[in-house]
UniProtKB/Swiss-Prot annotation:
Any one GO molecular-function label of the UniProt entry: heme binding
Compositional bias per record (Acidic residues), positions renumbered to this chain: 268-279
Residues of the signal peptide: none
Protein name: Peroxidase-like protein 2
Length: 884
């Protein structure tokens, strides 16, 4: 018995799926039985596959129940393209003008049923378990045709009028579903009827013994740098679809192709097994869904696939995994471009006559589906129409069957004997749907169960298990098209991959498709998305000077972030992130509206640190041509640049001094001692908190507020930029600057001393001593350091902004010594500030060891006076040194 005592209130689901519903611990767990929507029908009412039809009339010996037609006969007569009434192949080969091959949603079926269904476990007998009473036509029910079998079935074998003497039937053994074991679906029929003979039983009689030495668990895992597919029996098309979802878990489903659920929302109202209470909805896959409904995708498979002009028959793709490994991108492109078959009752002969073909042997996938349903005791078609509240079909001439009625009459004795798969596949599609009314009902109920029965569903309102509104908005930005670009390295894809390209669904460059993962993409590995391209599509770039992500909004912030009249809206940004240095800008909004920014165009230059980082605002920009001198490195390596007449220009925002009481911007709660503090002040500079500034609620000063843990900077190396991917870290340059000391260093003729009582990443901190940097190109002498908040410091003596803004340090992030122009300017919790511009960067404790500003001639004194430096320094700085 499974106990869920410890599972209550847990944030994440268990590994095996138990305790999703604490009142029904095993429902929906691994190895759980399928759900029964309708009472099963077995020949012996216990477990023998259904082989007899309904009672047609009474006799002296009882009720006469005719034999059901062979599954193979049904496949050939009803589902084969060769049996069209007027031999009109135009209907059977029609293609959908909208849906590409990707649109068959086979991947959905593989995700839900995983390509396998449980069947009753075989008895421990040396021979295959069989049903001796099964009367089979001259062709096997699931095996593909030999010439004689095919021709015999095409004309439909007439049974003799005299019934053969029935063979003695062994006493049936109950085989309830709870004892079922999942095995590969293609072998299910063979294990029961002994017809396929393709599985080798293991000594434990539970799973087949693999004849392939590579079929170990390690072989099934797949390597990171190769497609994660290890199913050689599957079609490469199916494997490619699986690969997309196994590499990218989060995505938005396009369910328009399965439309038809509209109007089915109240299906459960007419059935006793349903309840409006979510706790009573079982998050399980129904038997009919796994064995029949999801198999509708077989009708969407074409006869061949076209890869770069090569037409490859589907039969030639079986047992050919190399095709996926070698040509996966080409296969994906084909799936996106080639229209799929129109969904109707006709199935390609590649699946009915040549499925898994090996020499002279093949199988019929449609016959397997039909026979599998009988093995599972799935009731006939009419039972499910009644279950869905649809009118029962009483005649083969019913309009419900479209033009399939005459062919159904050829194989079935009664409409009540029609198998659910054949009957539902014969229905015309509902408007705008891939399904008829019966399968639409089954799909709608299944999706309802998965959504409302799952206590961990991502739209759950549970405050612990569900996502916040902001997280949902971010999830909504993830698209299947971008996932395909990211996974397969495609150059272009239509915005909706489940529809063929058209004027309404044009191909889009992968670089232009919005993506939440854009900052994780490596430019060296293919196309990457650009945050600013997304902004340019949705915002007025003419008035955009900066934008903050939703991470820092009020709902996820502490109480101290809701003030200054913005209660419930967001925090007031520090002046460095606003348009004029003093304006109050709400987090999540763009500081725009000032006339002086109307003509600024925002762009992301190629190279350098052009990729935007989460939590780093776009610096203010203006058309002030004096802001950056000609030849400044900022023109090439600006993190977020503005262009005016082709030149990158950045304006230094006004920075208020560390004057207590002048709170033009409030620091986030994580960076204060719990109360509002003036911008630029440090916890160590205010009375009562000297040397003892603690984070409220045990907040880690190195953790950025509102930023997901997987996006937090991992590196603690002071020479590395926090929050910046390794491939974006600045490369060491021979700048001639000294790198002596964990904090501090030399630049030009001046010395910069930075002191923090608790080290380069301290919290409490103390006074900040900033020396004058002679030879520096202007800047703010002594800058703004907020000594103590993580070794924070704006380092003076730099050009332009001069070490710019140490906004309370924000986690040891800022303090770019000797940088030109912006000099790494703005730091937000360690994720920014250090992203220097122009190769400038020393982050936190590095104290401006690699700056691009200042006089740039460190070592002149050394070269002019031998007594001022060592031989190593001479060799490093002096071009004409004898020791070099």
């Amino acid at each position: 018995t499974t106990s869920c005592t410890d599972a209550k209130g847990k944030q994440y689901r268990t590994a095996d799926g138990t305790c999703n519903n604490v009142n029904k611990p095993t429902v929906g767990s691994s190895m759980d039985k399928f759900k029964r929507d309708v009472k099963p029908q077995y020949d012996d009412k216990k477990g023998d596959p259904r082989t007899k039809g309904r009672c047609l009339y009474k006799t002296e010996k009882g009720c006469y129940r005719p034999d059901l037609p062979s599954a193979r006969a049904i496949s050939v007569v009803v589902h084969s393209k060769q049996t069209s009434v007027d031999d009109d192949s135009s209907k059977s080969s029609a293609v959908s003008p909208k849906m590409p091959s990707m649109g068959n949603l086979q991947s959905l079926g593989n995700l839900l049923s995983l390509g396998s269904v449980p069947v009753p476990a075989p008895a421990p007998a040396p021979e295959p378990v069989s049903a001796p009473s099964v009367d089979i036509a001259p062709a096997q029910p699931v095996a593909g045709p030999s010439i004689t079998d095919l021709l015999g079935l095409m004309s439909i074998i007439q049974k003799p009028k005299s019934k053969p003497k029935p063979k003695p039937k062994p006493k049936p053994q109950p085989k309830p579903q709870p004892e079922s074991k999942p095995i590969l679906s293609q072998g299910a029929i063979g294990d029961i009827l002994g017809l396929l003979g393709t599985l080798v039983a293991s000594p434990e009689k539970e799973t087949p013994v693999s004849s392939q030495p590579d079929d170990s668990i390690s072989g099934l895992m797949g390597k990171v740098d190769e497609p994660r597919i290890r199913t050689p029996k599957k079609s490469p098309r199916k494997k490619a679809r699986q690969s997309i979802f196994r590499r990218r878990d989060d995505r938005k489903d396009d369910r328009k192709g399965l439309r038809g659920t509209k109007g089915r929302r109240d299906d459960s109202d007419d059935n006793d097994d349903s309840d409006d209470d979510d706790d009573d909805i079982e998050v399980r896959i129904s038997n009919v869904f796994a064995t029949a409904a999801i198999k509708f995708v077989a009708a969407l498979s074409p006869d061949y696939i076209d890869i770069r002009g090569r037409k490859i028959r589907l039969r030639d793709t079986y047992n050919n995994p190399e095709m996926v490994f070698d040509e996966l991108p080409e296969l994906i492109e084909e799936m996106l471009q080639q229209p799929t078959e129109e969904r109707n009752r006709f199935i390609s002969k590649e699946l009915t006559d040549h499925f898994l073909e090996d020499g002279s042997r093949s199988f019929d996938e449609v016959a397997s589906i039909i026979q599998r349903g009988r093995d599972h005791g799935v009731p006939p078609y009419n039972w499910f129409r009644q279950f869905c509240g649809l009118p029962i079909v009483r005649s083969f001439n019913s309009r419900v069957f479209g033009d399939a009625g005459p062919y159904l009459r050829k194989v079935y004795k009664s409409v009540d004997d029609i198998d659910i798969y054949t009957g539902a596949m014969s229905e015309p599609n509902l408007p705008g749907s891939l399904l008829g009314e019966t399968f639409s009902c089954i799909f709608a109920r299944q999706f309802r169960d998965l959504k409302f029965g799952d206590s961990f569903f991502y739209l759950s309102d549970d405050p612990l298990r569900g996502f916040s509104k902001e997280q949902r908005r971010e999830l909504d930005t993830i698209t299947l098209s971008k996932a395909m670009c990211f996974v397969f390295g495609l150059e272009a894809v239509q915005m909706n991959p489940l529809r063929v390209p058209s004027a309404q669904n044009p191909l889009s460059d992968c670089e232009q498709i919005p993506s939440f993962f854009s900052f994780l993409e490596d430019p060296s590995e293919g196309p990457r998305s650009n945050l600013l391209s997304r902004v340019s599509q949705s915002e007025s770039v003419a008035s955009l000077s900066g934008i903050m992500p939703r991470f820092f909004d009020a709902e996820s912030a502490g109480p101290s972030m809701k003030d200054n009249g913005y209660e419930g809206v967001g925090n007031v940004l520090p002046p460095a992130f606003t348009t004029n240095g003093v304006s109050k800008t709400v987090v999540g909004a763009s500081p725009r509206g000032s006339e002086r920014f109307r003509d600024v165009e925002v762009e992301d230059p190629e190279g350098g640190f052009g990729m935007p980082l989460p939590g780093v605002p776009i610096p203010s920009m203006s058309s002030n041509t004096d802001a950056v001198s000609q030849g400044d490195p900022l023109n090439e390596l600006t993190q977020m640049g503005g262009t005016v007449d082709g030149e990158v220009e950045v304006e230094e925002p006004e920075i208020p001094g560390p004057q207590e009481g002048k709170a033009s911007g409030s620091l986030p709660r994580a960076f204060t001692d719990g109360r509002q503090m003036p911008l630029g002040s440090s916890p160590g500079s205010l009375g009562g908190v000297q040397g003892s500034a603690t984070q409220p609620d045990a907040l880690d000063p190195t953790i950025l507020p509102g930023v997901p843990l997987d996006l937090q900077p991992k590196a603690q190396d002071p020479t590395k930029l926090p929050g910046v991917p390794e491939y974006l870290q600045p490369k060491p340059k021979s700048s001639g600057l000294s790198t002596q000391g964990a904090v501090g260093g030399e630049m030009g003729k001046g010395e910069i001393e930075l002191e923090d009582q608790l080290g380069s990443h301290g919290v409490a901190g103390g006074a900040v001593e900033v020396g004058e940097a002679e030879g520096a190109a202007g800047g703010i002498d002594g800058s703004v350091g907020s000594g103590g908040m993580g070794g924070s410091v704006g380092v003076g003596g730099s050009g332009g902004m001069g070490g710019s803004v140490g906004v309370g340090g924000m986690g040891g992030s800022v303090g770019v010594g000797g940088s030109g122009g912006m000099g790494g300017s703005v730091g937000v919790g360690g994720m920014g500030g250090s992203v220097g511009v122009g190769g400038s960067v020393g982050s936190g404790g590095s104290g401006g060891s690699r700056g691009a500003g200042g006089s740039g001639d460190d070592g002149d004194d050394c070269c002019q006076d031998d007594s001022k430096c060592s031989d190593d320094e001479k060799q490093k700085y002096c071009k004409n040194s004898d020791t070099k």
